[in-house]
Amino acid sequence: MQKTISIILVTILAITAGHVANARERGKVTNLPIPRYVSMKAEEGNVRRGPSLSHRIDWVFKRRNMPLQVTGEHGHWRRVQDRDGQGGWVHYSLLSGARHVIVERDLTPLRTKPGADAEVNAYAEAGVVARLGSCELDWCRVTADGKKGWVQKAALWGVLPEELRD
């Protein structure tokens, strides 16, 4: 009987540990997942060394809709980084939950449906910022400069590899 109970407890612990390992960290302010992606709401945003106006401005993000990855939270401030890993603290009012991505590969095809054999609508150059739509396992629907299509997720920065969107 003791052995059976021990086996059951070990099994429960193993299952629970797996779920805890898969759980993503949550922000202490918003309770939203960390990391997560947001975009620049403003045309410009000061990037500071720390989470307050008294901290030095290290640089300025100057691209509206640019996707950024949130890696931390403190009060009204979000620690973010861009696709090059550069970042710092930005006031939350300069950020939007509207999702955008950056095309990473030059002449990336926008296809009529998910799949490498689907017809090509248009091509996007590397560095193009696109509005993110739905995502399947390996493909995401995007809109860039009025052109819509499906792009391989691996060609985009601003979406998690396991992320699915309706």
Question: What is each of the regions a protein language model found here?
Answer:
Residues 56-57:
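Beta-strand-rich domains and repeat architectures in extracellular enzymes and scaffolds
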Residues 22-49, 60-64, 71-74, 78-86, ...:
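SH3-family beta-barrel domains
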Residues 52:
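Intrinsically disordered, low-complexity polar regions and short flexible loop motifs
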Residues 15-23:
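Polybasic, low-complexity, intrinsically disordered segments
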Residues 1-7:
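Positively charged n-region of N-terminal signal peptides that target proteins for export
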Residues 7-16:
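Bacterial N-terminal signal peptides
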